[in-house]
Amino acid sequence: MLQLSIITINLNNGNGLRKTIESVVEQTYKNFEFIVIDGSSSDNSLDILKRFSDQISFWVSEKDSGIYNAMNKGIKIARGEYCLFLNSGDFFFSSDTLLKIFSLGLSEDVFYGDSFRFDNDKKKGFFIIEPDNLTLYHFFRKSICHQSTFIKRELFKKFGYYNEQLQIAADWEFNIKAIIINNCLTRHINIPVVYYDARGLSNTNREISLKERGLILNQLFPKRILADLIRLELLEKELLSINKSFIFKAYRKLKKILANNLSETPINVMLLHIFTL
């Protein structure tokens, strides 16, 4: 059985598309199909698709109504057991990434790895290490990187495709429905899967995302649960503030002790001064 469908969507990002295609083609693991959905790009994307056409299982270049419409097109074409969405400009961490992952013999509904987020090139960015356990509170605060998340294709038939009325948060909504509400089996794999391009995450997009998430939460959960999530968020921020204050005060006390006379101050006295704040 075909294990994986890699779905790439693209719009006027020819250079990023080329990088993504090369990354997919270089994979030493080969039990996958590669689907590219292009939104009728006007740059060099079509030339790149034609150049690599013999290494792409299916591609199309036509108008769509947005990101999630394009992703849903890819899902409906897909034949693999799992779907992975690798946007144009994103690329695998190494040529043996998929081999490492599928040699684990995974069978969970959703499994997800880690990622490296970059803004300009892969040398400038940071790793995102995902949690082993996914909770409602985790999704309330953030999400998981969809470029490093493998989803059983049958889940889209069970719980519906991505909500095309949303601009940014439809994958987040799907994760909550599948993982939190319907308790799908998940597994975190300690493998870096992708470098992903975050240059499209503008402040405007963040505002839209927050608004959409608020609407989704109000539709899916009663107010009393949301109230508890907000309380947890406020408590966590308060604890973080307390910890920062403690560290700052400890630093100032230690600096003062050292400035006075380090050689004459026993270590136990130093520690007593630091922790008696």
Predicted regions and their residues:
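Conserved nucleotide-sugar donor-binding catalytic segment
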Residues: 113, 127-216, 220
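Short aromatic/hydrophobic "clamp" motif used to bind/position activated sugar donors
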Residues: 83
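Glycine-rich, basic loop-to-helix element that forms the pyrophosphate-binding segment
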Residues: 20, 45, 61-78, 96
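Cell-envelope/extracellular polymer assembly enzymes that use nucleotide-activated donors
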Residues: 2-5, 33, 173
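Conserved donor NDP-sugar-binding/catalytic core segment of glycosyltransferases
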Residues: 91, 95-125
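A conserved acidic beta->alpha catalytic loop
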Residues: 30, 38-47, 87, 91
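N-proximal low-complexity "stem/linker" segments adjacent to membrane-targeting elements
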Residues: 1-26
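Acidic helix N-cap motif at the loop->helix transition within catalytic regions
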Residues: 15-18, 43-51
